[in-house]
């Protein structure tokens, strides 16, 4: 029987403190709120005890961040899309930010096992003055464990309505996409870090963030397969390809730290669970 799990997170600013409240149905919840940066920024960790998704499973994650609140959400482990012989798997995430809200959406990687049939959808709604930094890391198969991605299908959709939309369909039989230098060029990990704003970013802020990202990229081993751009005056995007997850995560976290400093004048302060 498929699992259908839902989680609703609501963040509000109360007396200079960001407070999290949540409701859940099924095996999806958050751990205790942490405040390593003080009361203004709330860190939460998503937990999905089954550890993976199979045919017909659905995860529905929704987070609402109120005016002036700042939330950081990560996950306790990778999202695992297992082999599926039947109905597709769907993970749907909807993030909504009120005026002046900030959110860091920083889940660990999604692992697409051989013969999976999965869709991962992320939608962000940003009010004027709201800002969100988000990460997406996808690994195709487990080639180092002798389980390459040679069958299956994965659909990836990321959207900030009216500003930016990315939609990709990866079919394991599409060798032109997987092997071509104009596609994934044989890499089994693709990742992006994005910064979206509900109001236009000044040219100075965009230039500062892009310069910071490019300096990190130039000093990294993945510099030939990574790049940072600004498709419009409300969005910044870092994209990269990697042979495996670890170097991709390393680069994303370094750029995230650089963007925190350049855009928000904040220290890196990685979630504690990343050190485990």
UniProtKB/Swiss-Prot annotation:
GO molecular function, one term: nickel cation binding
Pfam families assigned to the protein according to its UniProt record, in alphabetical order: UreD
Superkingdom in the source lineage: Bacteria
Any one Gene Ontology cellular component term annotated for this protein: cytoplasm
Subunit organization: UreD, UreF and UreG form a complex that acts as a GTP-hydrolysis-dependent molecular chaperone, activating the urease apoprotein by helping to assemble the nickel containing metallocenter of UreC. The UreE protein probably delivers the nickel.
Chief localization: cytoplasm
Name of the molecule in the record: Urease accessory protein UreD
InterPro entries xrefs: UreD (IPR002669)
Purpose: Required for maturation of urease via the functional incorporation of the urease nickel metallocenter.
Organism: Verminephrobacter eiseniae (strain EF01-2)
Keywords: Chaperone, Cytoplasm, Nickel insertion
């Amino acid at each position: 029987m498929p699992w259908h799990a839902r989680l609703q997170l609501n963040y509000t600013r109360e007396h200079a403190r960001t407070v999290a409240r949540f409701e859940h149905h099924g095996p999806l919840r958050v751990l205790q709120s942490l405040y390593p940066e003080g009361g203004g920024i709330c860190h939460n960790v998503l937990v999905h005890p089954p550890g993976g998704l199979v045919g017909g499973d659905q995860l529905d994650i929704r987070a609402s961040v109120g005016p002036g609140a700042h939330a950081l959400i990560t996950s306790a482990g990778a999202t695992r899309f297992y082999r599926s012989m039947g109905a597709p798997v769907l993970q749907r995430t909807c993030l909504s930010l009120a005026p002046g809200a900030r959110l860091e959406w920083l889940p660990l990687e999604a692992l697409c096992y051989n013969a999976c049939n999965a869709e991962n959808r992320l939608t962000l709604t940003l009010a004027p003055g709201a800002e969100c930094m988000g990460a997406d890391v996808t690994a195709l198969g487990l080639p180092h464990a002798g389980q390459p991605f040679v069958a299956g299908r994965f659909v990836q959709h990321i959207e900030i309505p009216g500003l930016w939309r990315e939609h990709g369909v990866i079919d394991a039989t599409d060798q032109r996409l997987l092997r071509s230098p104009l596609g994934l060029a044989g890499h089994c990990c693709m990742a992006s870090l994005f910064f979206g704003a509900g109001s236009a970013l000044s040219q100075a802020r965009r230039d500062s963030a892009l310069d910071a990202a490019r300096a990190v990229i130039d000093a990294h081993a993945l510099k030939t397969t990574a790049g940072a751009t600004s498709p419009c005056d409300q969005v910044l995007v870092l994209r990269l390809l990697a042979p495996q997850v670890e170097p991709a995560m390393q680069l994303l976290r370094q750029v995230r730290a650089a963007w925190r400093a350049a855009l928000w004048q904040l220290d890196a302060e990685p979630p504690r669970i990343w050190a485990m």
